[in-house]
Curated annotation (Swiss-Prot):
Transmembrane segments: none annotated. Coiled coil: none annotated. NCBIfam families: PRK00407.1. Keywords: Calcium, Metal-binding, tRNA processing. Disulfide bonds: none annotated. HAMAP family: Archease_arch (MF_01222). SUPFAM superfamilies: MTH1598-like (SSF69819). The keyword NAD does not apply. Ca(2+) binds at D17, D146, V147. It comes from the Archaea. GO terms for biological process: tRNA splicing, via endonucleolytic cleavage and ligation. This is Protein archease.
Protein backbone atom coordinates (compact mmCIF):
# COMPACT_ATOMS: atom_id res chain seq x y z
CA UNK A 1 0.00 0.00 0.00
CA UNK A 2 1.40 3.40 -0.98
CA UNK A 3 1.44 6.32 1.44
CA UNK A 4 3.77 9.12 2.49
CA UNK A 5 5.65 7.15 5.18
CA UNK A 6 9.40 7.81 5.03
CA UNK A 7 10.57 4.17 5.58
CA UNK A 8 9.35 0.97 7.25
CA UNK A 9 11.50 1.64 10.34
CA UNK A 10 14.70 3.35 11.49
CA UNK A 11 17.01 3.41 14.51
CA UNK A 12 18.11 6.37 16.60
CA UNK A 13 21.16 6.80 18.84
CA UNK A 14 20.57 6.37 22.55
CA UNK A 15 23.06 5.37 25.28
CA UNK A 16 22.78 1.67 26.32
CA UNK A 17 19.34 1.73 24.73
CA UNK A 18 18.08 1.78 21.17
CA UNK A 19 15.33 4.09 19.99
CA UNK A 20 13.18 2.54 17.26
CA UNK A 21 10.73 4.33 15.01
CA UNK A 22 8.45 2.01 13.05
CA UNK A 23 6.18 3.26 10.29
CA UNK A 24 3.15 1.95 8.47
CA UNK A 25 0.42 3.08 6.12
CA UNK A 26 -1.91 1.49 8.69
CA UNK A 27 -1.56 1.03 12.43
CA UNK A 28 -1.35 -2.75 11.84
CA UNK A 29 1.55 -2.32 9.42
CA UNK A 30 3.36 -0.07 11.90
CA UNK A 31 2.99 -2.73 14.63
CA UNK A 32 4.33 -5.39 12.21
CA UNK A 33 7.29 -3.19 11.33
CA UNK A 34 7.93 -2.56 15.04
CA UNK A 35 8.26 -6.34 15.49
CA UNK A 36 10.61 -6.70 12.52
CA UNK A 37 12.73 -3.76 13.69
CA UNK A 38 13.09 -5.39 17.11
CA UNK A 39 14.18 -8.72 15.61
CA UNK A 40 16.61 -7.06 13.18
CA UNK A 41 18.60 -5.75 16.15
CA UNK A 42 19.62 -9.39 16.83
CA UNK A 43 19.35 -11.36 13.56
CA UNK A 44 18.48 -11.10 9.87
CA UNK A 45 14.73 -11.67 9.51
CA UNK A 46 14.95 -12.14 5.74
CA UNK A 47 16.91 -15.37 6.43
CA UNK A 48 14.17 -16.79 8.68
CA UNK A 49 11.83 -19.28 7.02
CA UNK A 50 8.14 -19.21 8.02
CA UNK A 51 8.17 -22.91 9.06
CA UNK A 52 6.18 -22.64 12.29
CA UNK A 53 3.30 -20.45 13.44
CA UNK A 54 2.86 -18.88 16.88
CA UNK A 55 -0.47 -17.32 17.77
CA UNK A 56 -0.46 -14.32 20.08
CA UNK A 57 -3.41 -12.50 21.60
CA UNK A 58 -2.81 -9.47 23.80
CA UNK A 59 -4.87 -6.53 24.95
CA UNK A 60 -4.50 -3.29 26.84
CA UNK A 61 -6.60 -0.22 27.55
CA UNK A 62 -4.42 2.15 25.48
CA UNK A 63 -2.18 1.91 22.41
CA UNK A 64 1.03 2.64 24.33
CA UNK A 65 0.38 -0.25 26.69
CA UNK A 66 -0.52 -2.46 23.73
CA UNK A 67 2.78 -1.62 22.03
CA UNK A 68 4.66 -2.38 25.26
CA UNK A 69 2.93 -5.77 25.63
CA UNK A 70 3.48 -6.58 21.92
CA UNK A 71 7.22 -5.98 22.06
CA UNK A 72 7.49 -7.63 25.48
CA UNK A 73 5.75 -10.75 24.15
CA UNK A 74 8.17 -10.94 21.21
CA UNK A 75 11.12 -10.65 23.61
CA UNK A 76 9.62 -13.40 25.77
CA UNK A 77 9.25 -15.74 22.76
CA UNK A 78 12.86 -15.19 21.75
CA UNK A 79 14.24 -15.47 25.30
CA UNK A 80 12.30 -18.58 26.32
CA UNK A 81 11.86 -20.49 23.04
CA UNK A 82 14.55 -18.92 20.82
CA UNK A 83 11.76 -18.36 18.29
CA UNK A 84 13.04 -16.21 15.43
CA UNK A 85 10.28 -14.37 13.60
CA UNK A 86 10.21 -14.06 9.83
CA UNK A 87 8.86 -11.03 8.01
CA UNK A 88 5.57 -12.90 7.56
CA UNK A 89 3.23 -11.65 10.28
CA UNK A 90 -0.56 -11.73 10.16
CA UNK A 91 -1.84 -9.08 12.54
CA UNK A 92 -5.33 -7.89 13.41
CA UNK A 93 -5.53 -4.82 15.66
CA UNK A 94 -8.86 -3.58 16.94
CA UNK A 95 -10.77 -2.12 19.83
CA UNK A 96 -13.74 -3.40 21.80
CA UNK A 97 -13.64 -2.39 25.47
CA UNK A 98 -9.84 -2.41 25.13
CA UNK A 99 -7.34 -2.39 22.28
CA UNK A 100 -6.27 -5.86 21.17
CA UNK A 101 -3.89 -7.64 18.83
CA UNK A 102 -4.54 -11.09 17.44
CA UNK A 103 -1.47 -12.13 15.51
CA UNK A 104 0.15 -15.12 13.92
CA UNK A 105 3.94 -14.95 13.82
CA UNK A 106 5.73 -17.23 11.39
CA UNK A 107 9.31 -18.28 11.97
CA UNK A 108 11.62 -21.01 13.17
CA UNK A 109 14.10 -21.77 15.95
CA UNK A 110 16.96 -19.27 15.98
CA UNK A 111 20.15 -20.57 14.37
CA UNK A 112 23.13 -18.22 14.50
CA UNK A 113 24.73 -19.94 11.48
CA UNK A 114 21.61 -19.43 9.36
CA UNK A 115 20.12 -16.18 10.71
CA UNK A 116 23.34 -14.45 11.74
CA UNK A 117 23.91 -12.16 14.69
CA UNK A 118 23.64 -8.42 14.09
CA UNK A 119 25.37 -7.49 17.33
CA UNK A 120 22.74 -6.70 19.94
CA UNK A 121 20.74 -8.64 22.48
CA UNK A 122 17.59 -6.80 23.53
CA UNK A 123 17.00 -7.16 27.26
CA UNK A 124 13.77 -5.27 27.86
CA UNK A 125 11.07 -2.98 26.50
CA UNK A 126 10.57 0.43 28.13
CA UNK A 127 7.95 3.17 28.15
CA UNK A 128 10.74 5.76 27.81
CA UNK A 129 10.15 8.17 24.89
CA UNK A 130 7.24 6.05 23.64
CA UNK A 131 5.07 7.78 21.09
CA UNK A 132 2.30 6.63 18.77
CA UNK A 133 0.83 9.06 16.29
CA UNK A 134 -0.72 9.41 12.90
CA UNK A 135 1.18 11.72 10.56
CA UNK A 136 -0.80 12.67 7.47
CA UNK A 137 -1.52 9.30 5.80
CA UNK A 138 0.78 7.04 7.85
CA UNK A 139 1.46 5.94 11.45
CA UNK A 140 4.66 6.26 13.48
CA UNK A 141 5.44 4.15 16.55
CA UNK A 142 8.45 5.17 18.62
CA UNK A 143 9.85 3.13 21.49
CA UNK A 144 13.09 2.43 23.33
CA UNK A 145 14.54 -0.97 24.25
CA UNK A 146 17.34 -1.79 26.68
CA UNK A 147 20.26 -3.64 25.11
Amino acid sequence: MKCGKPVDYRYGEHTADVLIQAYGCTLEEAFKNAAIALAELTYHTEKVEPRYAKEITIDYNDLEGLLFRWIDELLFLFDTEKFAISREIVLNLGKNDVYYIKAVLYGEPYDIEKHGFTGLIVKAMTFHMMEIRQIDDYWMLQYVVDV
